[in-house]
């Protein structure tokens, strides 16, 4: 087992990809971008894909994070978006 900590593995600031999976809703990507803007203002161009049956959308977005706590906040805030099922 490695004796390294999370902070030793990652360098900050870091552009981290987040995949947000939620109900198929045309506003999901806009809501993900709005949360990303609150976390780290910038120009965001998310990638949106529909599931095979069209029931869900996955929105992939890169957010520049500055610490482990910032990553944790991103997961919490993105998961709090209405209709979101998972954040990876």
UniProtKB/Swiss-Prot annotation:
NCBIfam families from the UniProt entry: PRK04998.1 (NF003447)
InterPro entries linked to this entry: UPF0250_YbeD-like, YbeD-like_sf
Protein name: UPF0250 protein Sfri_0694
Entry GO CC: cytosol
Record's signal peptide: none
Family to which the UniProt record says this protein belongs: Belongs to the UPF0250 family.
PANTHER family named among the record's database cross-references: UPF0250 PROTEIN YBED
């Amino acid at each position: 087992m490695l004796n390294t900590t999370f902070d030793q593995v990652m360098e900050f600031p870091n552009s981290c990809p987040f995949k947000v999976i939620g109900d198929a809703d045309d506003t999901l990507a806009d809501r993900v971008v709005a949360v990303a803007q609150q976390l780290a203002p910038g120009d965001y161009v998310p990638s949106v894909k529909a599931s095979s049956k069209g029931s869900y959308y996955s929105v992939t977005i890169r957010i520049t994070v500055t610490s482990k706590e910032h990553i944790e906040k991103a997961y919490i805030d993105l998961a709090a978006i209405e209709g979101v099922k998972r954040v990876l």
